[in-house]
């Protein structure tokens, strides 16, 4: 699942294809595990329900550790920190379906390897 949140994720309205920092990370992760990405755009609340109900494996869209969806999905360890509007640091994460521990571990490894590319 993907929620538009530039620069982390942009969604092309015609094709439905996602681009941006997180979309690139997910695409390279999928290539590394020989998986195919199917972008399902939507608001965070709908995606949170979809992942909780088992309809999605992964949710991206500029999620942070303060996102209200931690009861719906397992959040990765933060892979980047950015300044927030209030002057604090926001820690960026992605969401994985609960119980998908192997996927979570592999994604976190990928994010750790790519961390030098993400600011």
Show the residue positions of the predicted features.
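Short glycine-/acidic-enriched loop or helix-start segments at secondary-structure transitions
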Residues: 10-11, 69-71, 106
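Extracytoplasmic small-molecule ligand-binding "clamshell" domains
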Residues: 1-62
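Acidic, polar ligand-binding/catalytic clefts
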Residues: 5, 40-101
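Extended ligand-binding regions for polar small-molecule ligands
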Residues: 23-33, 84-119
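Short, glycine/charged-enriched secondary-structure capping and boundary segments
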Residues: 13-16, 73-76, 109
